[in-house]
A protein has these predicted regions:
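Short acidic/polar mixed-charge low-complexity motifs
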Residues: 34-36, 111
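C-terminal structural segment of proteins
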Residues: 37, 42-44, 86, 91
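Phosphate-handling active-site elements
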Residues: 36-37, 64-71
């Protein structure tokens, strides 16, 4: 799948976003090494802590479908003039399953920003930190 096709899949998801508070629809498309694509949109709630971002929606759909590895890249789109990069929580969630993930963020005009997850979340907290901890 080309970058543009993956971004188009993410843009398609924006129409499903539930964003009565921010009015900022975000779409995401998470691609796997076998070509499978899991999509997601952001879903807001009056209790703001209960909101979920598009990136995590796509990841949770993949996990609930039995996928645990093989994620290669994710496209993230919003309607702003700037790039819609994954938030810190999304970066942390994605790093649990795909530390080498490529992130494509597209702005409203179609420009693409390309980064590795390791660039956006250097020295991330992971399961290895828990394995090396002393609990008492």
């Amino acid at each position: 799948m080309t970058d543009q096709e993956l971004i188009a899949r993410a843009r398609e998801m924006q129409k499903y976003a539930y964003v009565p508070y921010s009015r900022f629809p975000v779409g995401a498309a998470l691609e796997c090494d076998d070509g499978t694509v899991y999509t997601g949109c952001n879903v807001e709630n009056a209790s703001y802590g209960a909101c979920i971002c598009a990136e995590r929606t796509a990841l949770v759909k993949a996990i609930s479908d039995g996928r645990r590895k093989g994620f290669t890249r994710i496209a993230v789109v919003g309607n702003s003039a700037g790039f819609c990069q994954p938030c810190g929580i999304c970066r942390q969630m994605l790093s649990e399953f795909a530390p080498d993930l490529e992130i494509l963020a597209a702005d409203a005009s179609g420009r693409i920003s390309r980064h590795s997850l390791r660039e956006l979340l250097p020295e991330s907290f992971g399961s290895d930190a828990l394995e090396n901890s002393s609990n008492g």
